[in-house]
Structure formats: C-alpha cells, structure tokens
C-alpha cells in the first residue's frame, strides 16, 4: 500500500464526514478493518450523531464496502442520527437501490442520497433541528 489512507475523516457540527479514497484494490483487508474501527470510534464520540459519506473520490465499490457502510449506518441510527451520501455515481446509486439500502423507509438503516456535500449537510442539520424541536 502507498501512504494513502482508505478514508479521510472530518467533523462538521454533529456530522462525521467520511470520504473514501479509491480505488479500493490498493488496500488490504486490514486497511478496511482499521478504517472501519476509526469511523466507528469517531461516531461514538459524544455529540456526533450523523454520518455523511462523500463519494467524490470513488467510482466503484464492492460488497466489502457495502457491509462496512451498513454497519456505520446502523451505528449512526443507534446514535439517534441518520446517514447521508453524496456524489454517488449512477451505477452506485442503482446498486444501493437494488440492495434496497437507499431511500428505503422499510429498513432502519436507510440512507439518503444528495447531489453534493453542502446539500447533504443542510439535510442533516435540518434533521437535527427537527429533533431538537421535538425535545422542547
């Protein structure tokens, strides 16, 4: 492997932004495990609720990544948050819809798709606002 990391992480308010750095063929299983563990740890931090995965550096992903994405989405849901995706290619969007993981209200780990990071962050901020209003 080169010095490149599988994921880049950023925190924006209560949102963990994960940017995968493809192609994944450059990475080993241990790299996936370490990246997942770090993302899970960051989602477990107090005040972090939502997950945003930015696919701007990725053209394709396989079943290993789908499994990782599912587990992180379930963790966000356990934190009373949601998962959002942005910059999905048509092929990625189609695959996630076929797997019934994208915009599917019948599952508790459904993800929403957005054109870009700003739109996704606004969506998640609105979710937080609605949740905070319900608490009052």
Residue positions per predicted region:
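Amphipathic, Lys/Arg-enriched alpha-helical "gate/interface" segment within cytosolic domains
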Residues: 11, 32, 45-46, 50, ...
């Amino acid at each position: 492997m080169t010095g490149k990391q599988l994921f880049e992480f950023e925190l924006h308010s209560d949102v963990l932004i994960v940017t995968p750095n493809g192609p994944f063929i450059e990475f080993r299983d241990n790299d996936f495990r370490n990246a997942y563990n770090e993302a899970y740890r960051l989602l477990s931090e107090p005040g972090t609720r939502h997950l945003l995965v930015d696919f701007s550096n990725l053209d394709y992903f396989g079943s290993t990544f789908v499994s990782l994405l599912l587990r992180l989405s379930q963790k966000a849901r356990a934190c009373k948050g949601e998962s959002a995706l942005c910059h999905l290619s048509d092929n990625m969007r189609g695959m996630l819809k076929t797997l019934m993981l994208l915009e599917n209200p019948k599952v508790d780990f459904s993800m929403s798709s957005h054109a870009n990071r700003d739109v996704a962050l606004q969506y998640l901020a609105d979710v937080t606002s609605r949740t905070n209003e319900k608490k009052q």
